[in-house]
From Swiss-Prot:
Any single Gene Ontology cellular-component annotation: nucleus
Protein name: Transcription factor MafB
UniProt keyword terms in alphabetical order: Activator, DNA-binding, Nucleus, Repressor, Transcription, Transcription regulation
Family the UniProt entry places it in: Belongs to the bZIP family. Maf subfamily.
Gene (UniProt): MAFB
UniProt biased composition (Basic residues): 157-168
Location of region: Basic motif: 226-251
Low complexity composition-biased segments: 54-76, 169-194
Organism of this sequence: Coturnix japonica
Disulfide bonds listed in the record: none
Organism lineage string: Eukaryota, Metazoa, Chordata, Craniata, Vertebrata
């Protein structure tokens, strides 16, 4: 009964320790009865071996009740070395080191050093409670950033003077750092007007899309969209101007060609008129020659002195 009371007194209430103990399956070990004369000694040993308790539906079992007894704990001290080796092999088989990834030496050291593990767990729980208390005060200070150091000092918490002073100071420094970041961002990214003025119209029109994207790295999306819209407007304006210029050039070319054709037509008309006059002249001349020929033929036929007349 005294051993059970001592076990209950040394059980930690930490959930982490409870979860640590629940990972071990203690129901697969056999129960070995110990002599009555060694109950007190084995009870004290069990209090050292069990680091934490577990509240579960399984019956409470201790490592001492499931692990075979050590040769030093047996009632008769006349155990041979062969029996010692048998106890070590039997305990190694029952503890299932494959599941725990332990060697026989690690299993013995784990059973012996379990009391130190419980002390470390208790120290961790105390550190965890202190950290939670510090985090609670820090969260409380961030909820009320306008409270000054003098107000906190006068509120009746002098033992947290250093913590509140340490957390109250970052408020102006945070604002100053944010303002410096904004100034740096403004220096790195000038306003939209300066971004548009950074490139001339000729540069925007003559620059390729890949080169423009390389120059626009680091600017905001709105500035990039605005600059690309300006470039598209300039491109469309250039296209319209080039088309208008081409149309004007084509119009001038057609007008010149028309003038030349009109001149050629006039020249051809004049040539036709000249040829018509020449034709008429040649026609009159031909008619004259024809009439003269008929007259000469008639005069020769009426002459009696012709040699044919006397024949």
């Amino acid at each position: 009964m005294a051993g059970e009371l001592s076990i209950g007194a040394e059980l930690p209430t930490s959930p982490l320790a409870m979860e640590y103990v629940n990972d071990f399956d203690l129901m697969k070990f056999d129960v070995k009865k110990e002599p009555l004369g060694r109950n007190d000694r084995s009870g004290r040993h069990c209090t050292r071996l069990q680091p934490a308790g577990s509240v579960s539906s399984t019956p409470i079992s201790t490592p001492c009740s499931s692990v075979p007894s050590s040769p030093s704990f047996s009632p008769t001290e006349q155990k041979t070395h062969l029996e010692d080796l048998y106890w070590m092999a039997n305990s190694y088989q029952q503890m299932n080191p494959e599941a725990l990834n332990l060697t026989p030496e690690d299993a013995v050291e784990a059973l012996i050093g379990s009391h130190q593990v419980s002390q470390q767990l208790q120290g961790f729980e105390s550190f965890r409670a202190h950290h939670h208390h510090h985090h609670h005060h820090q969260h409380h200070h961030h909820q009320y950033p306008a409270v000054t150091h003098e107000d906190l000092a006068g509120s009746g918490h002098p033992h947290h003077h250093h913590h509140h002073h340490h957390h109250a100071s970052p408020t102006p420094s945070t604002s100053s750092s944010s303002s410096q970041q904004l100034q740096t961002s403004h220096q790195q990214h000038p306003p939209s007007s300066s971004v548009e003025d950074r490139f001339s119209d000729d540069q925007l029109v003559s620059m390729s899309v890949r080169e423009l994207n390389r120059h626009l790295r680091g600017f905001t999306k709105d500035e990039v969209i605005r600059l690309k819209q300006k470039r598209r407007t300039l491109k469309n304006r250039g296209y319209a101007q080039s088309c208008r210029y081409k149309r004007v050039q084509q119009k001038h070319h057609l007008e010149n060609e028309k003038t030349q054709l009109i001149q050629q037509v006039e020249q051809l008309k004049q040539e036709v008129t000249r040829l018509a006059r020449e034709r008429d002249a040649y026609k009159l001349k031909c008619e004259k020659l024809a009439s003269n020929g008929f007259r000469e033929a008639g005069s020769t036929s009426d002459n009696p002195s012709s040699p044919e007349f006397f024949m």
